[in-house]
From Swiss-Prot:
NCBIfam families: rpmD_bact. Gene3D superfamilies: Ribosomal protein L30, ferredoxin-like fold domain. InterPro entries: Ribo_uL30_ferredoxin-like_sf, Ribosomal_uL30_bac-type, Ribosomal_uL30_CS, Ribosomal_uL30_ferredoxin-like. GO terms for molecular function: structural constituent of ribosome. This is Large ribosomal subunit protein uL30. The keyword Ribosomal protein applies. The gene is rpmD. Signal peptide: none annotated. It comes from Treponema denticola (strain ATCC 35405 / DSM 14222 / CIP 103919 / JCM 8153 / KCTC 15104). One of its GO terms (cellular component) is cytosolic large ribosomal subunit. Part of the 50S ribosomal subunit. GO terms for biological process: translation. Keywords: Ribonucleoprotein, Ribosomal protein. Belongs to the universal ribosomal protein uL30 family.
Length: 61
């Protein structure tokens, strides 16, 4: 079974560049404090790394 991660948007995207906002939307995050779960594959981990200053990541068991 693949590892899963939980991604929570903790800071607003107001004032951020368009690629950062697009990455947040691609992860499935819309509003502040919204949370989504993803498989921890290289594509998702790369997106999370790009917006690490706006999100909080937890590894799920």
């Amino acid at each position: 079974m693949a590892k899963r991660i939980s991604v929570k948007l903790v800071k607003s995207t107001i004032g951020q560049k368009q690629p950062v906002c697009s990455t947040i939307r691609s992860l499935g995050l819309k509003k502040l404090n919204s949370t989504v779960e993803h498989d921890a594959n290289p594509a998702v981990l790369g997106m999370v790394k790009r917006v690490a200053h706006l999100v909080e990541v937890k590894e799920l068991n």
